[in-house]
């Protein structure tokens, strides 16, 4: 974290799904149809904050191209945050007059599924961005996007929903990639430092497992005995 704060540089690979966002924005601009950004379903967790960073980047790209994006929020507490993120994106690129607050919508949990499907159908969205905490809604929204021919980019850390996103979407951030994407886009020292530390811990754990397996195969149990202490 200190190194990133000092140098502003830590090696984080840019994910293919992030490049696809630029492709999707170009698509909605050429087709003259809006995009839809759905921030998961009714639970606010770490995935929600990662989705905020992706929303910020996407909104800036949409604003630059003077295109339109409808943001669907499942929780009242994230509605004002989303409004400020999208409004800030338009201000940043000098298009504040193009910002439409009606395109950032709170959809109550009881009506969320029907409301999102209605938006997809009525607006004939050309691209969908499905990021955040998803359950069975993943297949509902992704299939609805397929019906209208949208280019779809998704991401969730809920591994039990990933098969539906992978099957239905053009690009998917798999598992913890959504957190990596959020850290990559935000360049926040705390997020980047946490991400790098987690990855380093994973490499260390894998190395210990491999070394231990080799040593046990060679009938050397010194590492096993050490870890038991």
What are these regions (language model features)?
Residues 24-25, 49-66:
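Histidine-anchored nucleotide/phosphate-binding helix
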Residues 13-30, 34:
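Membrane-cytosol interface motif
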Residues 166-229:
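C-terminal functional extensions of proteins
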Residues 127-176:
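Extracytoplasmic/lumenal ectodomains and periplasmic regions of secretory and membrane proteins
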Residues 115-123:
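Short, well-structured alpha-helical segments in soluble
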Residues 61-63, 67-113:
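Long, charge-dense
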Residues 1-9, 96-99, 161-163:
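Gly-rich Lys/Arg/Thr-decorated short loops/hinges at beta-loop-alpha junctions or inter-strand turns
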Residues 1-15, 215-221:
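Hydrophobic alpha-helical transmembrane segments of small proteolipidic membrane proteins, enriched
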């Amino acid at each position: 974290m200190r190194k990133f704060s000092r140098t502003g540089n830590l090696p984080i690979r840019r994910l293919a799904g992030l490049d696809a966002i630029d492709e999707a924005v170009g698509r909605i601009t050429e087709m003259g149809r809006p995009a839809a950004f759905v921030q998961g379903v009714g639970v606010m967790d770490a995935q929600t904050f990662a989705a905020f960073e992706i929303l910020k980047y996407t909104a800036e790209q949409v604003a630059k191209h003077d295109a339109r994006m409808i943001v669907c929020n499942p929780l009242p507490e994230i509605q004002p945050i989303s409004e400020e993120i999208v409004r800030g994106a338009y201000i940043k690129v000098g298009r504040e007059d193009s910002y439409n607050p009606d395109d950032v919508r709170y959809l109550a949990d009881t009506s969320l599924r029907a409301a999102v499907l209605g938006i997809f159908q009525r607006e004939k969205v050309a691209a969908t961005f499905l990021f955040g905490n998803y359950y069975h809604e993943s297949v509902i929204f992704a299939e609805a996007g397929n019906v209208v021919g949208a280019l779809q980019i998704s991401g969730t850390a809920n591994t039990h929903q990933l098969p539906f996103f992978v099957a239905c979407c053009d690009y998917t951030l798999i598992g913890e990639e959504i957190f990596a994407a959020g850290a990559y886009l935000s360049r926040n020292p705390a997020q980047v430092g946490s991400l790098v530390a987690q990855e380093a811990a994973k490499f260390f754990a894998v190395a210990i497992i491999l070394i231990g397996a080799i040593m046990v195969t060679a009938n050397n149990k010194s590492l096993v005995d050490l870890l038991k202490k």
